Each structure stands twice: as C-alpha cells, then as structure tokens.
Amino acid sequence: MKLLIAGGGTGGHLFPGIAVAEEFLARNHSNEVLFVGTERGIEARLLPRLGYRLECITASGIKGQSPLAKIRSAAQLLYGYAQSRRILKEFRPDLVLGVGGYASAPVVLAARGMQIRRFIHEQNAIPGLTNKLLARFAEKVFISIEESRKFFPEDATILTGNPLRKEILWNVPLGQKTPASDEKLKLLVFGGSAGAHRINTAMIESLPFLAGVKERLIITHQTGEKDQAEVRKTYEQSGFAAEVTPFIDDMAAAYSNADMIVCRAGATTIAEVTACGKACIFIPYPYAADDHQRRNAEALLKKEAGYMILERELSGESLAFQVMELIAHPGKIEQTGRNARSLAQLDAAQVIVDEMTREQACTEK
C-alpha cells in the first residue's frame, strides 16, 4: 500500500506526518511513503536526512497578503495543482494525508479530482485556513484537540490526538515524581528550532529574582544561534548552573531529564510534553495564526495540566514568580505532570493509520 503525505513548512505540521509515516511503514515492509512539500519548508532539509522520499511543488499562502501577492499565490496554487497531479499519477498512492501547510491544498484537491482517498490532520485548537477549506473534500478529519471539532463536519471528524515520533514515545517516562525539598530541580527552557528571543530575554531577566534558589536549579536553555553567547554570559555572571545551547538534537532526552519546562505552545510541543507528563509554563507565540497557541495552552489550563504567561504579561519577574511557585510547592510539579499525562494520546499515529486503511479496505470491497 502507498501513502502520500502532503504539507509541512514548519515542524508543527511535519512531525505528525513523520509519526504517521513511521507507523504506516511499520505495518508492512512493502508499504511505501512519499512526502510532498515545498523547497522553503523544514521538510526540504529534514526529510532527506531521515531517509524519506520528498517531492517539492510550488505553493504559498494567500491569507493576509496584498492583492498583487494574492494573484501571484493563486497562480502558484494552480501550478502546484498541476505538479500534484503529475506526482499522483507517477506515485499512484492509495491514500493521501494532508497535514497542513501550503503544499497540502493543491495535493489534496488533486487527489479529489483523481478519486484517491484523502484525509487531513489538524494539530491546533483553531484550524488553519487550509484545513478549514480542505475538510469538505476529505473522507475523514483527524483532530488533536477537542476544541477544534466545531470547525469540521461532525460525522467525518475523529479525535485522535497529535501523532508522536517513535523517538519521543520510546523515551516517555513512567511518571513524574514529587521532588524532595532538598533535591536539585532541572528546568528546560526552549523556544523552537530557532529559539525565541522574547523567552530568552525574560529568562535572563528572571535571574535576579531567582537568586535565592539558584543552588536548587540546573537549567538547560536552548536559545537559537543569535542569543546564545549573551545568554550564556549572563548565566555565568549570575552564578547559575546552566547548559546553553543553540539547538537540542535529542529532545526526547531533554524532556525525560526535565522536572519543569518553559516553552511555546505549538501543537507538537504540547503533544510531546503531555506525553512525557511534564509541568510546563507555556508562553504562547502571540503572532501565530488566529492566536492558536494561546488556545492550545488554554485547553491544558482548563484541566490544570499547565501554566501560562501571555507574552504581553511576560517579564523577568512574572516568569520567576511562576518558577518559584513550583519550587515552593513541589507537589504541584507532580500533579500538573500527572494531569498533563492524562491528556496524552500516545496511540494517535496508530489510530490514524487504522482509520485510513479501514477506509481503503471499504473502497476495495
């Protein structure tokens, strides 16, 4: 059986697709997977390194652009549609899964025209424009968060969770324990592959407020390239035990080692930290489409499965206050992690592959 996975652009779209690909290939050694994305997306750098086949098409967004740019994007969409039809004819997939991102639309639309079974996966609480449009053409819509159900056809929508890569699943800890009162606490701070300048700034501004507990903290801080030197210098001058790195290659190990986490609230990040059962302070990226990161974090706050500081309220003092609150009440670290873990859906990739192959089996009867 052949599966084509369309979309990407960011890790939030791509990583769930990789997780589904891993599960699909594990089912049968004769199964094949082809990814379709764009040359500008993270997929162009990552997928060849992971050994996956990738075809690139021309595609770009329309929302929020000038009238002239919209005309150009519409022309690219038509060209991308033609490219998608060629790829579909050559690869002849049994199933097409759109995971969001610019490349998803022309491929799923082309698959509809060629009567190939097509599905979409939505990672966020507030769906992107692409998936809202494609939902009407999909056999099934897989959602990660219950809050997004209202945007899609009820009879075609299935809550699966956000698929996780095997490297994350294999390192999921058995549980979060309450740290002892004299135990050192490991704080992980990260802001995505390029880092997050605002989080970096707030963290170093928090150090004077955290001075009284610095002997209890061991910090791992992923900054991105730009801020690394300045952040490392500030930790050293302030006397904090900190590992400062531009990138974290092994996120599974980083999650496993952490007691507390400060991070953004992208869908993949939330899926990973809930699977690992970690107490997180979420700082949603305020410019994400439709403010979906805030809504992602709020879904956890409702279940007492995390904490949130909006970026407009973020300061060194506010961040330090939240960290100090967890240090002062270590039982909250365990309970918040347990609540987060209860929301994790570790079998998301399995459920998605099950549903797609079931639809295909119905077609063949």
UniProtKB/Swiss-Prot annotation:
Keywords for the protein's UniProt record, in alphabetical order: Cell cycle, Cell division, Cell inner membrane, Cell membrane, Cell shape, Cell wall biogenesis/degradation, Glycosyltransferase, Membrane, Peptidoglycan synthesis, Transferase
Lineage: superkingdom: Bacteria
Enzyme class: transferase
This protein's record includes keyword S-adenosyl-L-methionine: no
Known EC number: 2.4.1.227
Cell compartment(s), UniProt: Cell inner membrane
GO biological process entries: carbohydrate metabolic process; cell division; cell wall organization; lipid glycosylation; peptidoglycan biosynthetic process; regulation of cell shape
Membrane topology label: Peripheral membrane protein
Record has Repressor as a keyword: no
Pathway this chain belongs to: Cell wall biogenesis; peptidoglycan biosynthesis
InterPro entries associated with the record: GlcNAc_MurG, Glyco_trans_28_C, GlycoTrans_28_N
GO cellular component, one term: plasma membrane
Reaction(s) this enzyme catalyzes, per UniProt: di-trans,octa-cis-undecaprenyl diphospho-N-acetyl-alpha-D-muramoyl-L-alanyl-D-glutamyl-meso-2,6-diaminopimeloyl-D-alanyl-D-alanine + UDP-N-acetyl-alpha-D-glucosamine = di-trans,octa-cis-undecaprenyl diphospho-[N-acetyl-alpha-D-glucosaminyl-(1->4)]-N-acetyl-alpha-D-muramoyl-L-alanyl-D-glutamyl-meso-2,6-diaminopimeloyl-D-alanyl-D-alanine + UDP + H(+)
Molecular function in Gene Ontology: UDP-N-acetyl-D-glucosamine:N-acetylmuramoyl-L-alanyl-D-glutamyl-meso-2,6-diaminopimelyl-D-alanyl-D-alanine-diphosphoundecaprenol 4-beta-N-acetylglucosaminlytransferase activity; undecaprenyldiphospho-muramoylpentapeptide beta-N-acetylglucosaminyltransferase activity
Binding site for UDP-N-acetyl-alpha-D-glucosamine: 10-12, 124, 165, 193, 248, 293
The family this protein is said to belong to: Belongs to the glycosyltransferase 28 family. MurG subfamily.
Family matches, as PANTHER family: GLYCOSYLTRANSFERASE, UDP-N-ACETYLGLUCOSAMINE--N-ACETYLMURAMYL-(PENTAPEPTIDE) PYROPHOSPHORYL-UNDECAPRENOL N-ACETYLGLUCOSAMINE TRANSFERASE 1
Chain's role: Cell wall formation. Catalyzes the transfer of a GlcNAc subunit on undecaprenyl-pyrophosphoryl-MurNAc-pentapeptide (lipid intermediate I) to form undecaprenyl-pyrophosphoryl-MurNAc-(pentapeptide)GlcNAc (lipid intermediate II).
NCBIfam families on file: murG
Name of this chain's protein: UDP-N-acetylglucosamine--N-acetylmuramyl-(pentapeptide) pyrophosphoryl-undecaprenol N-acetylglucosamine transferase
Source organism per UniProt: Geotalea uraniireducens (strain Rf4) (Geobacter uraniireducens)
